[in-house]
Amino acid sequence: MRIFLFSLFVLAAFSSYAQDVTPVTVPAKAVAQLEKIRKQTQVIREVGKKGSSLPAETRPILNKILVQSATDFLAITKRKAGPTKEAYYQSLDAMLARLHPLVPQLEDRQQVAEYYQDLLDIVGIDSSEGRLTTFVEGAAN
């Protein structure tokens, strides 16, 4: 009985590990594209060119988080162990949680979601698995 329980525990541990690591094949130009989008976002923050319904004091905070997101995606992309979907999703979840209280309007949430979809597209991930939809629809709740 102990051997059965032990082997069940070991199999469960290995299966959970296997589910936690989904390697991503990142396109060759991803690093350059992420650096470009990060620089563009920094310029928008500094110059304040992009229109929005957000209060003026919120815009620099929002852009700082967007720049941090691009920086995080760059760091994940450059990992020696290789990037994983879960690492990108973890970064996405953390940043969306920070942005949630700052972006109450649906139109602004849609713009933010488009930015993150661009980041995901750059690194070769087709879907946010509902994360961006949940973020955008959170404005209605």
Residues covered by each model-derived region:
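Short terminal alpha-helical segments
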Residues: D20-L74, A140
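Positively charged n-region of N-terminal signal peptides that target proteins for export
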Residues: M1-F4
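Amphipathic alpha-helical binding modules
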Residues: V21-Q33, Q105-N141
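Short, well-structured alpha-helical segments
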Residues: N63, Y89, L132-T133
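Amphipathic protein-protein interaction modules
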Residues: R79-I122
